[in-house]
């Protein structure tokens, strides 16, 4: 089987095709997936770290702090999931207004990368999963509890991640979210690459909108 044959997948607007489209017989477009999967260099090899032995943990801590601040601003809590067994790192919870009401919750998979700088003038930027299972947990059909991907992009220079001024603490750079439920990728693709909309900047207003949609049983994409 050729590479082209093995890399056919169903088209979805958030799948990063990096490809040319091939149409046949009036059916769904067939696409050629380019450059997805395989073994790459370690993702921290290019980082100017304070301590290379801890930088991955520090990237996680940076994103957790960002999201905890966003959740607090939206009147929510962020509860970390201690065991990564089902592709979820955190729960974002809006408490009920009264004891008789229900809380609203979404699950979140947190990813932090230094390898891309989103351009707000462009519609998307790309993110590649390091394992197929991380994608599958987000793409599978779920019942009530929905799950989103939250990707943080930050500087490869660790000492530039934050800067304090008298007006506040600046965090570089930001988090973006994507709702991937229902996506389909060929089983042969081991490290799917997805498109993250640059309009989906994660802040308190975005989190509130996501939780409102979840509360109404709507698609989180609106």
Give short role names for the model-derived ranges.
Residues 5-7, 14-86, 92-222:
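Mixed-charge (Asp/Glu-Lys/Arg
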